[in-house]
Curated annotation (Swiss-Prot):
InterPro entries for the chain: aa-tRNA-synth_I_CS (IPR001412), aa-tRNA-synth_Ia (IPR002300), Anticodon_Ile_BEm (IPR033708), Ile-tRNA-ligase (IPR002301), Ile-tRNA-ligase_type1 (IPR023585), Ile-tRNA_ligase (IPR050081), M/V/L/I-tRNA-synth_anticd-bd (IPR013155), Rossmann-like_a/b/a_fold (IPR014729)
Organism whose genome encodes this protein: Listeria monocytogenes serotype 4a (strain HCC23)
Major subcellular location class: cytoplasm
Domains as described in the record: IleRS has two distinct active sites: one for aminoacylation and one for editing. The misactivated valine is translocated from the active site to the editing site, which sterically excludes the correctly activated isoleucine. The single editing site contains two valyl binding pockets, one specific for each substrate (Val-AMP or Val-tRNA(Ile)).
Protein name as it appears in the record: Isoleucine--tRNA ligase
Single Gene Ontology BP annotation: isoleucyl-tRNA aminoacylation
Keyword line: Aminoacyl-tRNA synthetase, ATP-binding, Cytoplasm, Ligase, Metal-binding, Nucleotide-binding, Protein biosynthesis, Zinc
Gene transcribed to yield this protein: ileS
Length: 921
């Protein structure tokens, strides 16, 4: 007889290697074929809903790790909710209008000016849809489960129709107006930009101090006195209309080299050295309020510059006197309006000076900086020039600097409902908590929202103009345009004449001849995505507004979170979301931003081809995503190692229950041994902790909880000593079936708990566990937390035992290093105990030699009896010696009773009994 044939060795079809790049697409094809997404919705029909609303990624370019991070977090949440008693449909979306697509089309050699706007827009739409298709394939390969056949796309007619309604509703409430005021203007995009489209980068600029000569001192200043201003935008001097001083600051008139100058008193010490005023004497001190309406002369144009009082002039930097160009700054515009100054912005859309700036016509504004400073020097007005590096606004698409430029634009008034917006922010649950403060301050401090764009690819502003110039936005026109867009798409605006866009028989008192024109500007793309609560949540029967969760990157506080809040509060009076969760950015292994120029980009598509989607997903679960996260080949290697541990744990569990049938072989909890109960309690604790972590969106906690359970509780303890039972004992022995019961519960529980994170691997485990033709793991519910008898008492006892076991393991390790023993199975452990430890061992049930994975064990009372050579800790002393007896050929345990059965001279008594009873014919 071959004794190895009497061992019950593990058997499973679950392979050690995942081969994920090849296996995952097979599972995905199966899910698609079986309509798994639809089945999940059917299973959960009638349950409470949990709606995570997808913030639409921009349909341009290859997916990056930020996309993978974002979509995987969403997918984990939706999968969790779908297994936790909720109906949680997921409708993915795309943002498809805007400049990057126009630019991409231009790069293909398309000449926009050589075709009609409608033709150009068709090319943009085609390009956007190919990008959507490419990204959709990438997201599906990542294992994202959703309604991929019916996503929402901002260029679709039904979406645009609802967006028009949002605009119409805001206009009806008086929130939409046209005005000329300074807005962020991007010469590189030739369009106005909203605050959300601005990013700050360092820029080197000329910093200049300029003298304006007083022509009318109003009895406070002598004629010819110089008021000194400071600016870092010399190109705005041609548009200067005034100087602002703070009414509550003290200003000094100083005399230096026969000239008088005015600066803020608080800044004089720093200016003495900077402007060469070391020897200057103070002639008089005046209050800023006394300088109100003093008149100075523009340095090189024949016009006045009026001195005004404004709070934005401070003594923090410069001179305390602020150069004011109402056409090129928000504060300047507001103070200019108060003092009735002209709003001069002598630049065209490309940032080139017009004839309104004599001497600089046809010059790009940035190039004009040098010309302006030379002109100031020529007329003797330039006191000082130096260069500084400062944070400056840039166009987030083109990465080029932007300017403030007054133009006629359409705005959404924020003041009209700012208090409602702030109240709505307070009513939302924010994770991380600082998100509330961030958005609250943003809403509190923001100006009106410029919603018009001077571009072609976007949703047209549905505005008509009468013959007298009056803008027409009525219920009748809005509803008509909305339905036209629903039927034909927004291109109809550019394809048809005005008369064919207006409702039949439309009249207006401002057009006695029945003539009308239409607006040519389009809407800000943030108005597009910001209308999704209306176009998607409100419009789709399976969804609802407000959503339970918006979850995006932390850049969306100024973007989608903000624009969605604005439009939703404007038309419904409440936020479109109950909870907002934000994540950080994906950086490289050294914490640097990924960029092609640095050569440090890691693309999810490439990682999936090499390692599999489940590795990318496990990486997402491993990081603290609420801050910026790091990813590199090395980090993914570490994650792959954890994946391997989890997979091997599953394989061991599956292999050792191949002859176990839960309906017939399971041992009830009350009939388990205490150590088995301990594992069931630990497993139950894991269920509670993991579910709590899912509920709190703390996926890295789950990663550590499950990894620790697989490594510490299972691999290093329970599965380790189990081999002496499940391989060796008779197939139906109580102890073996008890351990198999725990194994079965563990594999079922772990598979369900991991399903939202590792959908492909858990499906493979489930298939191996339950067999072919089984319902997907993703149609199961998560395990319930059970109430297990005596759990606190059992846990306390066995946790204490595990601490002592750690000491025994250390002693065995020491003995191995000292060459006292080879394998631990050759050892005998003698444990010297006192007090609590003695009481503990008296109360424990178990085969301690088996639990310590040694051949013999002896418990001795009295620490004082331990020999000097014993390994001592605070509670116990451990003596390691070589076990007496022979090694059993079958179980490899050293036993004194090897050969007790003469028919089986190489077997111990236990193994001989098993062989005789179960394997001898």
């Amino acid at each position: 007889m071959e004794y190895k044939d009497t061992l019950l060795m593990p058997k499973t079809d679950f392979p050690m290697r995942g081969n994920l790049p090849n296996k995952e697409p097979e599972w995905q094809a199966k899910w698609e074929e079986e309509k798994l997404y639809e089945k999940i919705q059917e299973k959960n029909a009638g349950r409470p809903t949990y709606i995570l609303h997808d913030g639409p990624p921009y349909a341009n370019g290859e997916l990056h790790m930020g996309h993978a991070l974002n979509k995987t977090i969403k997918d984990i949440i939706v999968r969790y909710k779908s297994m936790a008693g909720f109906s949680s449909p997921y409708v993915p979306g795309w943002d498809t209008h805007g400049l990057p697509i126009e630019t991409a089309i231009a790069k293909k050699g398309v000449k926009r000016k050589e075709m009609s706007i409608a033709e150009f827009r068709k090319l943009c739409a085609e390009y956007a849809m190919t990008q959507v298709d490419g990204q959709r394939t990438g997201f599906k390969r990542l294992g994202i489960n959703g309604d991929w056949e019916n996503p929402y796309i901002t260029l679709l007619p039904e979406y645009e129709a609802e967006q028009i309604k949002v605009f119409g509703e805001m206009a009806k409430k008086g929130y939409i107006y046209k005005g000329k005021k300074p807005v962020y203007w991007s010469p590189s995009s030739e369009s106005a930009l909203a605050e959300a489209e601005i990013e700050y980068q360092d820029k080197t600029s000329a910093s200049i101090f300029v003298a304006f000569k007083v022509t009318d001192g109003k009895g406070v200043l002598d004629e010819g006195t110089n008021i000194v201003i400071w600016t870092t935008t010399p190109w705005t001097i041609p548009a200067n209309m005034g100087i602002t001083v703070n009414p509550d600051l003290d200003y000094v008139v100083i005399e230096s080299a026969g000239e008088k100058y005015v600066v803020a008193e608080a800044l004089l010490p720093s200016l003495r050295e900077k402007l060469g005023f070391e020897d200057a004497t103070v002639v008089k001190t005046v209050r800023g309020s006394e300088l109100d309406r003093v008149v100075t002369k523009h340095p090189f144009y024949d016009r006045d510059s009026l001195v005004m009082n404004g709070e934005h002039a401070t003594a923090e930097a410069g001179t305390g006197a602020v150069h004011t160009a109402p056409g090129h700054g928000e504060d300047d515009f507001l103070i200019g309006k108060k003092y009735d100054l002209e709003v001069l912005a002598p630049l065209d859309d490309r940032g080139v000076f017009t004839e309104e700036a004599p001497g600089f016509e046809g010059v790009f504004y940035d190039t004009a900086n040098k010309m302006v400073t030379e002109k100031l020097e020529e007329v003797g007005a330039l006191l000082k020039m130096e260069f500084i590096t400062h944070s400056y606004p840039h166009d987030w698409r083109t990465k080029k600097p932007v300017i403030f430029r007054a133009t006629a634009q359409w705005f959404a008034s924020i003041d009209a409902f700012r208090d409602d917006l702030l109240a709505a922010v307070k009513g939302v649950n924010w994770t991380p908590a600082w998100g509330e403060t961030r958005l609250f301050n943003m809403v509190r401090d923001r100006g009106d929202w410029v919603i018009s764009r001077q571009r072609a690819w976007g949703v047209p502003l549905p505005i008509f103009y009468a013959e007298n110039g009056e803008a027409i936005i009525t219920d009748e026109t809005i509803n008509h345009i909305s339905e036209l867009f629903r039927e034909h798409g927004s291109n109809v605006w550019f394809e048809r004449d005005v008369k064919d866009l207006l409702p039949a028989g439309f009249t207006h008192p401002g057009s006695p001849n029945g003539e009308f024109t239409k607006e040519t500007d389009i809407m800000d793309v943030w108005f597009d995505s910001g209308s999704s609560h209306q176009a998607v949540l409100n419009a789709r029967p399976e969804l609802s507004r407000p959503a339970d969760l918006y979850m995006e990157g932390s850049d969306q506080y100024r973007g989608w979170f903000n624009s969605s809040l604005t439009t939703a509060v404007a038309i419904t009076g409440e936020a479109p979301y109950r909870n907002v969760l934000s994540h950080g950015f994906a950086l490289d292994g050294e914490g640097r931003k990924m960029s092609k120029s640095l050569g440090n980009t890691l693309l999810p598509g490439k990682v999936i081809k090499q390692l599999g989607a489940d590795i990318v997903r496990l990486w997402v679960a491993s990081v603290d995503y609420q801050a910026d996260v790091r990813v590199s080949d090395e980090i993914l290697k570490q994650v792959s190692e954890v994946y391997r541990k989890i997979r091997n744990t599953m394989r061991f569990l599956l292999g050792n229950i191949n002859d176990f049938h839960p309906t017939t072989n399971a041992v009830s909890y009350e009939n388990l041994r205490e150590v088995d109960k301990y594992m069931m309690i630990k497993l139950n604790d894991l269920v509670k902790n993991v579910k709590d972590s899912y509920e709190a969106f703390e996926f890295s906690a789950i990663y550590h909880q499950i990894n620790n359970f697989c490594t510490v509780e299972l691999s290093q303890f329970y599965m380790d000593f189990a081999k002496d039972v499940v391989y060796i004992e008779a197939a139906d022995s109580h102890d073996r079936r008890a351990m198999q019961t725990v194994f079965y519960e563990a594999v079922v529980t772990l598979t369900k708990l991991l399903a939202p994170i590792l959908p492909h691997t858990t499906e493979e485990v489930w298939n191996s566990l339950i067999g072919e033709g089984v319902e997907s793991i993703h149609l199961q519910d998560l395990p319930e937390v059970k109430v297990l008898a005596d759990s606190e008492e059992i846990t306390a006892k066995w946790d204490a035992f595990m601490q002592i076991r750690d000491n025994v393991q250390k002693a065995l390790e020491f003995a191995r290093n000292e060459k006292l023993i080879g394998k631990s199975m050759l050892a005998k452990v003698t444990l010297y105990v006192d007090g609590e430890a003695k009481t503990l061992f008296d109360s424990l049930e178990g085969d301690f030699a088996q639990l310590f994975i040694v051949s013999d064990f002896e418990l001795v009372e009295g620490l004082e009896n331990a020999p000097e050579s014993a390994f001592k800790s605070n509670q116990v002393a451990v003596q390691i010696t070589v076990a007496e007896g022979e090694t059993c050929e079958r179980c490899r345990v050293v036993k004194k009773d090897v050969g007790v059965n003469p028919k089986h001279p190489t077997l111990c008594g236990r193994c001989a009994d098993i062989v005789v009873k179960h394997y001898e014919a």
